[in-house]
Amino acid sequence: MSTTGQVIRCKAAILWKPGAPFSIEEVEVAPPKAKEVRIKVVATGLCGTEMKVLGSKHLDLLYPTILGHEGAGIVESIGEGVSTVKPGDKVITLFLPQCGECTSCLNSEGNFCIQFKQSKTQLMSDGTSRFTCKGKSIYHFGNTSTFCEYTVIKEISVAKIDAVAPLEKVCLISCGFSTGFGAAINTAKVTPGSTCAVFGLGGVGLSVVMGCKAAGAARIIGVDVNKEKFKKAQELGATECLNPQDLKKPIQEVLFDMTDAGIDFCFEAIGNLDVLAAALASCNESYGVCVVVGVLPASVQLKISGQLFFSGRSLKGSVFGGWKSRQHIPKLVADYMAEKLNLDPLITHTLNLDKINEAVELMKTGKW
């Protein structure tokens, strides 16, 4: 029976308040309005961004909310005026929209679409939510809210992909893989024969490693306090790995000793201010580039010695790996289907939505 135009009742993982665990609830998902798409979410990743939300009571979020932004699914229905997807299409959800009209979208080097700011309201463009639970309106998150069996997203935050793509794998292209891989390829523009250091070997960091390898880096040094991550990092391209806790000197001094002149390209893939300072200090003093890939706390100010900038070092931000979301994501999926990209090592566990709190615990212990 068709559900077009009807309210859909389904399961969602709701955060009712800061610091609380996810609660699996039945929610009502309203039909899409103009320029909106309702999607059956088939697969979604648990990203470090959600972990930061769960671990902080100080983020400027509205509750209750449905998190999740790393998703893939099938279009269930479309609102008036939608022209780029149709019911039955396989799609990837995009926390970073591409409106195609703003200054960033029209600039060949830009990808930070102005419509991203809409996500901060945690509502749709008309100022309302498409989710309700127990008679209460539930806030959206990150333009996507994929921790729900069905979600409603603006058309500019949806990318149609290959009809035979495995959604349980390509959902990672929705954020983690693209963010890390693109940070190396697009943001840093890693050069052949260069030396790279990746601080943090989670899913995003491993994707950075793959990006550095694809760009032709001669030496890729992985840095993490969890030695269990080293084997996979080396399988994906890291030439060596270091645990700062095992070193007698600060990591930046060790990296200078190992390379004689410092690192060409450093990547902070954790979202830790102290690690960022160490990564920047590890860069070659004449031309080293440090890219901030991890999400840093918005409420904390950077404290980096000004002496580090009495040099040719560069510190760069990166959002979604520099990709223009709707334009480039289908191409990345096509590359995966052509076996040019490897997502499989990034998948450690597959759980049902009602096991989401178990997934959180696995990630906290470094097993996810």
From Swiss-Prot:
pH dependence: Optimum pH is 10.0.
SMART domains assigned to the protein according to its UniProt record, in alphabetical order: PKS_ER
SUPFAM superfamilies cross-referenced by the UniProt entry: GroES-like (SSF50129), NAD(P)-binding Rossmann-fold domains (SSF51735)
Modified residues (Phosphoserine): 23
Binding site for Zn(2+) 1: 47, 69, 175
Catalysed reaction equations from the record: a primary alcohol + NAD(+) = an aldehyde + NADH + H(+); a secondary alcohol + NAD(+) = a ketone + NADH + H(+)
Regulation: Inhibited partially by pyrazole (10 mM) in the reaction mixture containing 100 mM ethanol at pH 10.0.
Annotated Zn(2+) 2 binding sites: 99, 102, 105, 113
GO MF annotation: an example: alcohol dehydrogenase (NAD+) activity
Keywords in alphabetical order: Cytoplasm, Metal-binding, NAD, Oxidoreductase, Phosphoprotein, Zinc
Pfam families per record: ADH_N (PF08240), ADH_zinc_N (PF00107)
Superkingdom of origin organism: Eukaryota
InterPro entries listed in its UniProt record: ADH-like_C, ADH-like_N, ADH_Zn_CS, GroES-like_sf, NAD(P)-bd_dom_sf, PKS_ER
EC annotation from Swiss-Prot or TrEMBL: 1.1.1.1
UniProt note on tissues of expression: Stomach and liver.
GO biological process terms on file: retinoic acid metabolic process; retinol metabolic process
Cofactor: Zn(2+)
Gene3D superfamilies: Medium-chain alcohol dehydrogenases, catalytic domain (3.90.180.10), NAD(P)-binding Rossmann-like Domain (3.40.50.720)
Binding site for NAD(+): 200-205, 224, 229, 293-295
Cofactor stoichiometry and binding remark: Binds 2 Zn(2+) ions per subunit.
Main location group: cytoplasm
Annotated Gene Ontology cellular component terms: cytosol; extracellular exosome
Miscellaneous note of the record: There are 7 different ADH's isozymes in human: three belongs to class-I: alpha, beta, and gamma, one to class-II: pi, one to class-III: chi, one to class-IV: ADH7 and one to class-V: ADH6. Isoelectric point (pH(I)) is 8.6.
PANTHER family: ALCOHOL DEHYDROGENASE (PTHR43880), ALCOHOL DEHYDROGENASE 6 (PTHR43880:SF20)
Family membership noted in the UniProt record: Belongs to the zinc-containing alcohol dehydrogenase family. Class-V subfamily.
Protein name per its UniProtKB record: Alcohol dehydrogenase 6
